[in-house]
A protein has these predicted regions:
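Catalytic nucleophile loop
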Residues: 118
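Active-site segments that bind and position negatively charged phosphate/pyrophosphate groups
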Residues: 217-255
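Amphipathic, well-packed alpha-helical segments that form the structural scaffold of globular domains
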Residues: 95, 193, 211, 233-237
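ATP/NTP phosphate-donor binding region
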Residues: 3-108
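Short, glycine- and charge-enriched coil/turn segments that flank and shape catalytic ligand pockets
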Residues: 41-44, 68-74, 212-227, 242
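A glycine/threonine-rich phosphate-anchoring loop and its flanking beta-alpha core
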Residues: 17, 123-216
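Acidic-aromatic/histidine active-site loop/patch
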Residues: 115
């Protein structure tokens, strides 16, 4: 794979059966989000932004204000942050919110947050009225390079992680890499684990670049983050296109 270029806006298109399914758009702010969502013909549709209590404080108002002129109605559903809330009880509360606000099959959900938000929102979208459209607005490194891409959704059941789930492709993945500047160090490290795995397993040139630019990446310099996320998006796209349900894509270490 050739190295990706450093650009302020990058677009990666995911294909299935050689047909374009959705775009992964990466920018440095949210200003291009209205233009991207307008391409989904949402002007006469309701939109529910799903997020958690941490991301709500940082980005919900900004995103809601940007998208309000693009949609018939914009509402939000906020649940307590944490894996322990990624369960059917929270999904039930989201269903109730959608029903009370008269959401139908023509309406849309948007996941604003990390993997927990994306998994839960995607699962709700896959199952509400037998499936409604949704988009991903990932705000953590792990979700930007992995979990927001590919359509895997699900929630935990009792002590069992991701026991209840479905495959449901997003209509758009919109990444603002500047959200990584507010990410706690432990969550940034978790995302870097996936990034390094991409290089080790899929692209030696990428792994070498990661080693050479480690200081800039860990310092969260925008150019380094932009290239990291874009390169990982290209790798993830190739995996999803080859194996949409990722049934045969398994990483083996030390075996």
């Amino acid at each position: 794979m050739t190295e990706v270029k450093n650009e302020k806006m990058n677009r990666v298109t995911v294909h299935l059966d050689e047909k374009p399914i959705y775009d992964i758009v990466m920018t440095e702010d949210f200003s291009a989000l209205p233009g991207e969502i307008e391409k989904l013909s949402i002007s006469n549709r309701r939109l529910c932004i799903v997020t958690d209590s941490n991301v709500e404080k940082l980005y919900l108002n900004e995103v809601k204000e940007l998208l309000a002129p693009c949609c018939k109605t914009v509402i939000s559903f906020v649940f307590p942050a944490g894996e322990e809330h990624k369960n059917l009880d929270t999904v039930r509360d989201l269903y109730e919110t959608l029903i009370l606000n008269h959401f139908d099959r023509n309406d849309m959900l948007a996941a604003l947050g990390g993997g927990v938000v994306g998994d839960l929102c995607g699962f709700a979208a896959a199952t509400y009225l037998r499936g409604v459209a949704f988009m991903q607005i990932p705000t953590t490194l792990l979700s930007q390079v992995d979990s927001s891409i590919g359509g895997k959704t699900g929630v935990d059941f009792d002590a069992y992680k991701n026991m209840v789930g479905a495959f449901h492709m997003p209509k758009l993945v919109f990444t603002n890499i500047n959200t990584l500047q507010t990410l706690p160090d432990n969550q940034f490290s978790a995302g870097m684990g996936e990034v390094i795995k991409h290089g080790l397993i899929k692209d030696a040139a990428y792994y070498e670049w990661l080693l050479e630019n480690a200081a800039d990446i860990w310092a969260r310099k925008p150019d380094a983050l932009r290239k990291t996320v874009t390169w990982s998006n290209e790798i993830k796209r190739a995996v999803v296109e080859k194996d949409p349900t990722e049934e045969h894509t398994v990483a083996f270490f030390g075996r």
